[in-house]
Amino acid sequence: MKIHIFLFVLFFFLVPIATRGVKCAVKDTYSCFIVRGKCRHECHDFEKPIGFCTKLNANCYM
């Protein structure tokens, strides 16, 4: 019985928390390539670091 309760808590409460990182990566990709145009390899004065585009060999968005 305790295993069923544990699985219920794990599935319904912890899984949505774990998927937030995926949504952030998708949001960063959209912001970087669609809204902002392109990624840069170096940060300039007014640019800020981003998360997912660093995996695509870029550090900042314009």
Curated annotation (Swiss-Prot):
Residues 1-21 form the signal peptide. It is found in: Secreted. Its main location: secreted. GO terms for cellular component: extracellular space. InterPro entries: Beta_defensin_dom (IPR025933). One of its GO terms (biological process) is cell chemotaxis. GO terms for molecular function: CCR6 chemokine receptor binding; chemoattractant activity. This is Beta-defensin 133.
